[in-house]
Amino acid sequence: EPHMTMPRILALGILVIGGCTPVTDTNPPNIVYMLADDLGYGELGSYGQSLIRTPNLDRLAADGMRFTQHYSGSPVCAPSRGTLLTGLSTLRSQIRDNYEVGGYPDPEELGQMPLDSGTYTIGTMLQDAGYVTGAIGKWGLGGRESLGQPRFQGFDYFFGYLDQQLAHNFYPTHLWRNGSRVDLDNEYFSAHQRFEGTDPTDPEQYKRYQGNDYSLDVMADDALRFIEENRDHPFFLYLPFTIPHVALQVPDSSLAQYDGAFEEEPYLGDPTYLPHHRPLSAYAGMITRMDDHIGRILDHLDELGLAENTVVMFASDNGTTYTGGVDAEFFESTAGLRGLKGSLYEGGIRVPLIARWPGHIEAGTESDEVSAFWDMMPTFADIAGVEAPADIDGTSILPALLGEQRNDDRSLYWEYHGLWNGAQAVRVGQWKGVRLGVHEDPHAPIELYDLEADPFETSDIADRYPGVVEQIRAVMDSRTESDHKPWNFASTGEG
């Protein structure tokens, strides 16, 4: 280039000195991992969504790699996050379902079943690698009196909801910063109530379901501050956003972005969560507002000169929900995949994964590498240049990120206890096995689908491939017994 600028010359010099290895010992990359809550496979523009606007995530995909066969750890919140943080699938992980230590409701904020004290998490691993670790958002793996809290599980810093139940309300009275309560400018109201006004079409009668401090906004501001404060050394920032989990609540400015977009009927809070006079616009507005904040985070990385040396990832903890006024059919939220949140069919567990790392991940690429949440721990270890624990279920997807295909035929396993009277699923290569009603019958029949030929799981071909079914049954039967009896099937534990 005839007019090469001094910064460009310097950058080239640094590139030559640094060599072409993905990771240098002197300057390990920052890692920002963003996790949506109940966002379906088809709810981003880059995954085919046409009604909900996600320009910043679409830009992230255009600048990086989009995965088409990535799986969450579970079809519901807590166990999915547990697999992400520990590198263990629900074949043998501690947390295999949502479990409310404090019951419903939970005024003491005892939260969900906690991770054991001393669990080796992604946070612990990256702390050991010299990273400052932060988590901002929804935790769900230990309440305020437990050793499962982030500050005891490898995170130097936490701000957000410890208890998933409180995260049902986007206008909470308070959040938690490490071990301290942080009050917000919101009056208390339950996140589960029916419409009690006189006119369900009157927007004013829904104001009671709003407050002043929208938790997403407060947490996004905190994320910008964390990045700024830790700009001079390697950091890992885990951002488990609460969007678009119900209740349907969003500030008026985001609702207004969808004025006139949809013909919609009010949702009156039946059967659960909160009423909303414009439920389609509220849902779309929530996702777009999250996308706005992601844009702010990406811009902040640019402004601080950190974007080049920061791996940014975005995923979702499970598929779209089936309740609270959400219309997954209207938005084609799963892009045709069968099932929703709580299901082990593809719509419940196949999720978006977008990854950007300038200079390493080729822009505008796509990978059909089969991967899952428990692969993140060894992937982050590779990125940070450290060893992952040997005894985990994950495999690093760094080769896929760098454009090398792996796609081995390892098996991926899920189990879920909250619906279907107990369910298990296994993916091996092109094959997917699903077994329902396992609490009742540990030898329940296994459905078999060929995901290459039948991605929407419409045709059970178990009778045609008995050998594959037996291979899948062996994986299902190899699950370890959980210490929590309700999370066992009669065949492998005390159910």
Where are these regions (language model features)?
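Short, Lys/Arg-enriched N-terminal segments with co-localized hydrophobic residues
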Residues: 1-3
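Formylglycine-dependent sulfatase
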Residues: 20-447, 451-491
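Sec-dependent signal peptide recognition
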Residues: 5-12
